[in-house]
Amino acid sequence: MNESFDPAAAVVIVAIIFFSFYVVGSTASRKKIAKIGSSIQQAVAELGGKTTAARFGVSAAVLSFKGLGNMEQFSVVVGISSWANPLSYVISRVMKKKDLLILRGKISKPPSSSFTLIHKDSPAMRYADRWGTFVDRIDSYVLCSVEENAPKNFVEQVVSALRPLDILYLVSFSKELPHLHVYASPSEPEKIKTLLSILKKLI
C-alpha cells in the first residue's frame, strides 16, 4: 500500500535543508570574510599603517585605515559570495560573479592627472567606458582617461610595478577625491600585501 504524499512534511523537509544551509553557510562565510579582513589589517600594520575601524558581516567587511605612506586615509570593502543562501550562491556562480576587494584612498599629494588602468581579462572591462575614453593598450592593461594627455612615464611606471600581480582588476588615479581606486581579487592574502606595498611605493 502506497502512502499518500504529505505536502506539510515536504515543506518541513525543505525548510530544514535551507536552514541547515543557512547555518553552515553563514558560519563558513563569516570565517572566510574574517580571515580576509584580518589578513588585510595585518598587512597594513606590517607596512606601517593603522586600522581605524573594522566591521565584519556574513559576506562583507568594511575596513578603514590611515598612515600608509602618502596615503593619508583609505578604506577597503571586501565582498564575497555567501554560502548562506544556496540559490543566491548558485546564481552568483552561474553569472560568474567574483569575490571583490575595493580600495578608495586619499593621497597627501593628489595626482597631477587622472587615468585608469583596467586589466584586459578582468570583470571591470565590462564597465571600462565609465572610467573615460580608451587611450591605449599597455601590456595586459587598457588605459582610459577623461583627459587628453595621460602622464606616459608614470603610467608605464605603474604598469611595470603591477606586472607581477594577477589579482588586480583595476587601478585608477584621480585629481579629485577619492584620489585612488583599486579593484582586486581578495583571494590571496599575501598578494594583497604585495599590492599594498606597491601602491605605497608608487604614491
Predicted regions, residues:
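Short, strongly hydrophobic alpha-helical membrane anchors
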Residues: M1-S4
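Single-pass alpha-helical transmembrane signal-anchor segments
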Residues: P7-V24
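Residue-level detector of alpha-helix boundaries and kinks
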Residues: F21-G25, A184-S187
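Generic secondary-structure transition motif, activating predominantly at the C-termini of alpha-helices
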Residues: Q41-G48, V159-D166, K200-I203
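Short amphipathic C-terminal alpha-helix that caps PH/PH-like domains
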Residues: K191-I203
